[in-house]
Amino acid sequence: MEVFMNLKKMAALRAVDEIDDGDVVGLGTGSTTHYFIEELGRRVREEGLEVMGVPTSYQSMFLAAESGIKVTSLAEHDVDVAVDGADEVDPDLNLIKGGGAAHTLEKIVDSSAASFIVIVDESKLVERLGAFPLPVEVIPAACRPVKLKLESMGASVNIRSSEGKDGPVVTDNGNFVLDAAFGVIDDPGAMESRLNNIPGVVENGIFAGIADMVIAGTSEGLKILR
């Protein structure tokens, strides 16, 4: 675990080099992005880098504020560069995200950015998406019918449970998350669209065709994919 954390940090530190003075930065959510936000904040405090951050979760918002990064929103600014982690990345830079249950706002921010950079360790690089269960955010009233629909499509589906309280995980948007294990996903773009057409689905964790760069920390050093 410590090795992977070091590889995550390696990728995160490299991503900060892509940030220019004056940028509005999309701040992803998760353990790898945590390192990115901390280092970005250090450069703000110690080197005078001037940036603003658009957080994708309360977790990222609080960390940005603690790190000295000015927080803004999509209502006020366009995003120059978004930096986010991923649970899986295929050779075409399609992603599965949502392990942190923040994928809806992550997708909004990441897809609206002029440039979207993904930071991962080497364990997240896969030939084909699907080993990681696909997160699907649903409004609570639609939980059961959406679960049945996903199962009819061949998925094994679980309602994600919370570790901090009894009952299901509740997203920052007040919704539930279904983790749908489909196995190998042959056409990520088609699957992304199909899932989002199910009534009651808010967003799913496939990010097809929006990443511009992947920075991966590996045991042999940094690997850059474009």
Curated annotation (Swiss-Prot):
GO molecular function, one term: ribose-5-phosphate isomerase activity
Active site: 106
Keywords: Isomerase
Pathway the protein contributes to: Carbohydrate degradation; pentose phosphate pathway; D-ribose 5-phosphate from D-ribulose 5-phosphate (non-oxidative stage): step 1/1
Keyword DNA-binding: no
Gene3D superfamilies: 3.30.70.260, 3.40.50.1360
Subunit structure: Homodimer.
Function: Catalyzes the reversible conversion of ribose-5-phosphate to ribulose 5-phosphate.
Protein name (Swiss-Prot/TrEMBL): Ribose-5-phosphate isomerase A
Native source species: Methanothermobacter thermautotrophicus (strain ATCC 29096 / DSM 1053 / JCM 10044 / NBRC 100330 / Delta H) (Methanobacterium thermoautotrophicum)
